[in-house]
Amino acid sequence: MEQTWRWYGPNDPVSLSDVRQAGATGVVNALHHIPNGQVWPVEEILARKAIIEAAGLTWSVVESVPIHEDIKTQTGDYLKYIENYKQTLRNLAQCGIHTVCYNFMPVLDWTRTDLEYVMPDGSKALRFDQIEFAAFELHILKRPGAEADYTAEEVEQANARFAAMTDAEKARLTRNIIAGLPGAEEGYTIEQFRARLADYDGIDKAKLREHFAFFLKNIIPVAEQVGLRMAVHPDDPPRPILGLPRIVSTIEDMQWMVETVDSIANGFTMCTGSYGVRGDNDLVAMIKRFGNRIYFTHLRSTCREENPKTFHEAAHLGGDVDMYNVVKAILEEEYRRKQEGHPLLIPMRPDHGHQMLDDLKKKTNPGYSAIGRLKGLAEVRGVELALKRAFFE
């Protein structure tokens, strides 16, 4: 696997020097300062690439080229935004960058309720609490019909949880959900959030799939023409939330994608921490079935709690993800490609990490502190080395 590291650009508290010392050789980056829907100019791409290469690293993966909400709802200037997206892909390929991670999640990117969940060892993790999320939906957002998405017991627990919250806790919960986590391209006020959700009235899973298919049928031929690999990121969490459909959550969704646009350019990001939240997702089976379409991996683990829809981010080798067999399956795919004359490694980044040690005293991007990811990368690297020695050499 190619060892990579997500870097948020010149304002990231983790420097490129830190990245190189962590042992990564590739950088996962995006031009976050360019508004959604606008073309990424060649000169901007080359300028960022030069910064990365000056540090002795390679810009391996773009994460992400965000998809404008108009494309997802097929409203407004969606056709113009699709043309802009095509041009950005051409520009990236012209600059020698050939792997793009993206997602098709409506309104929100990845979602958590607690950004400072204290683990038994004192480190801090990210957490999604189903009951707190219900409290937000029912009492802060006041989404019509939200009760139908929860069990009677969950509604009762959410009512009690909200009643016990201080104003500061309510504000923090709201901010965690709608203000935009690292990598999310948009944050909202509560009024803007309600309006954005309303844009999806009448858009169910079938309709969102229709819009996604339209996007893919326009984008993938361009990607194929310029030699670029598109790697869709799964929904996080991988289930409908806020009354919004989710369409990249299961192995069935992956199968639908490859059948809808059967092109080698139409591929996946295997994010074990996202897919792995669902107990019915067999990660190893996913990798084995769609290995030839996996162009990027995010390796992390989560741990489902008593309510299986509540989870926290575990240590990279702990939790519910069988990291040993996941890495083994990825290496088997790399070996298969090598045997067929395609020796390029699959980029892997240690996804998220606990805030620990000195990072507990620093301002960090939630999930993206340095030391937790350093630990995760070292652990995964060790698993990879042991597997290679045992099975591939």
From Swiss-Prot:
Listed Pfam families: UxuA
Q: Which cofactor does it need?
A: Fe(2+); Mn(2+)
Q: Which reaction does it catalyse?
A: D-mannonate = 2-dehydro-3-deoxy-D-gluconate + H2O
Q: Could you tell me the superkingdom of the organism this chain comes from? A: Bacteria
- UniProt-recorded Gene Ontology molecular function terms: ferrous iron binding; manganese ion binding; mannonate dehydratase activity
Q: Might you give the EC number(s) for this enzyme?
A: 4.2.1.8
Q: What UniProt keywords are attached to this protein's entry?
A: Iron, Lyase, Manganese
Q: Name one GO biological process term.
A: D-glucuronate catabolic process
Keyword Iron applies: yes
Pathway membership of this protein? Carbohydrate metabolism; pentose and glucuronate interconversion
TM region(s), chain numbering: none
Q: Which HAMAP family match?
A: UxuA
Q: Please explain the role this protein plays, according to its UniProt record.
A: Catalyzes the dehydration of D-mannonate.
UniProt lists the family membership as follows: Belongs to the mannonate dehydratase family.
Report the protein name in the record.
Mannonate dehydratase
Q: What gene does the UniProt entry assign to this protein?
A: uxuA
